[in-house]
Amino acid sequence: MADLISYDDAIDAAYDIFLEMAPDNLEPVDVILFTAQFDDRGAAELVDISDDWAGHVGFDVDKESYAEVRIGLVNEENDVLDDVFARMLISRDPDQKFCHILWKRD
């Protein structure tokens, strides 16, 4: 197995993918909200990989080789990322590129 990319690089890659795909996968109002408030409240953060990913991607997720990144807006009152626009599972193996996104749905 190749050396895994760092968690910081995984977050950066996830954010780049999110920006590219968000206009086609989010409601226009959510894209406007995210864009307008990202500087003050936006976040892309690494979280523990949820156990439900196997059901979404069809394989058991190796928690060392993958990262889960959540992208959204932080609640200013409690500093919690509670308005999640995308949950992303991204491979940290540069030879096995993979990304799966669960988009916010109203």
From Swiss-Prot:
Transmembrane segments: none
Coiled-coil ranges per UniProt: none
Domain of life: Bacteria
Function: May act as a double-stranded DNA (dsDNA) mimic. Probably regulates the activity of a dsDNA-binding protein.
NCBIfam families cross-referenced by the UniProt entry: PRK05094.1
Similarity comment text for this entry: Belongs to the putative dsDNA mimic protein family.
Name this protein carries in UniProt: Putative double-stranded DNA mimic protein VV1228
Organism: Vibrio vulnificus (strain YJ016)
